[in-house]
Amino acid sequence: MRTLLVFLLLAIFVAVLIGNVQVEAACKEYWECGAFLFCIEGICVPMIG
């Protein structure tokens, strides 16, 4: 049970790291940003609200 919890936390941490890289990455088209991100003025922006 504890191993599963650690794995879950690690997966979330990695997802956040990847998300931060995507947000900082320059983009030309909206699909380059991945899920739940928009391309605004060449920057991947998280979709909030």
Curated annotation (Swiss-Prot):
Position of the signal peptide: 1-21
Tissue: Expressed in salivary glands. Highly expressed in the head, body and tail with a 2-3-fold higher expression in the head.
Subcellular localization, as worded in the UniProt entry: Secreted
UniProt entry keywords in alphabetical sequence: Amidation, Disulfide bond, Secreted, Signal
Primary residence: secreted
Highest taxon of the lineage: Eukaryota
Any one GO cellular component localisation term in the record: extracellular region
Transmembrane spans: none
Cystine residue pairs: 27-39, 33-44
Isoleucine amide sites (modified residues): 48
Propeptide positions: 22-28
Sequence similarity: Belongs to the annelide toxin family.
Remaining remarks: Does not show effect on voltage-gated calcium channels, potassium channels, and tetrodotoxin-sensitive sodium channels. Does not show activity on Nav1.7/SCN9A, and shows very weak activity on cation channel TRPA1.
Function: Leech salivary gland peptide with unknown function. It was originally described as exhibiting analgesic function by specifically inhibiting rodent Nav1.8/SCN10A and Nav1.9/SCN11A voltage-gated sodium channels, as well as showing analgesic activities in several mouse models. In a second study, the synthetic peptide has been shown as having very weak activity on Nav1.8/SCN10A at the highest concentration tested (90 uM) and as being only very modestly active at hNav1.9/SCN11A, with a modest peak current size reduction (~19%) at high concentrations (10 uM).
Protein name: Peptide HSTX-I
Species of origin: Haemadipsa sylvestris
